[in-house]
């Protein structure tokens, strides 16, 4: 199993998603969390917030295939879901696919290394 830290909202009222996205993304960036899962209406805002943090590779996934590919090819460490577009059953399948899929490495590692180099250069 895995340890779960719920850093989400506690109600139905509208909130500022960056305030919540930063909690998970900062945890992944610092190494405190191995992975994170974020949800907002479209998923776009949370993905933008999370990808501001060094070492975070957030992927907005709307289906199981993109969830698997984001892990296999990109070693994504933050999954972002679109709450308005994803029903609970589909969300469960996406999360399961994402959690169970390993990074393939190989040619994909070379590409990740290039992304890390770019990130180091730009985040000084």
Question: Could you tell me what each predicted segment is?
Answer:
Residues 16-20, 61-62:
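Short secondary-structure boundary/capping elements
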Residues 19-42:
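Short, structured active-site "lid" loops
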């Amino acid at each position: 199993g895995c340890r779960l830290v719920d850093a989400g909202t506690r109600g139905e009222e509208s909130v500022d998603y960056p305030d919540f996205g930063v909690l998970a993304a900062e945890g992944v960036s610092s190494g405190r969390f191995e992975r994170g899962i974020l949800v907002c209406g479209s998923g776009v805002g949370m993905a933008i917030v999370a990808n501001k943090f060094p070492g975070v590779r957030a992927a907005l996934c709307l289906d199981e295939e993109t969830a698997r590919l984001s892990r296999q090819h990109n070693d994504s460490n933050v999954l972002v879901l679109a709450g308005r577009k994803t029903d609970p059953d589909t969300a469960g399948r996406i999360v399961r696919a994402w959690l169970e899929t390993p990074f393939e490495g190989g040619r994909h590692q070379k590409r990740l290394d290039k992304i890390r180099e770019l990130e180091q250069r730009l985040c000084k």
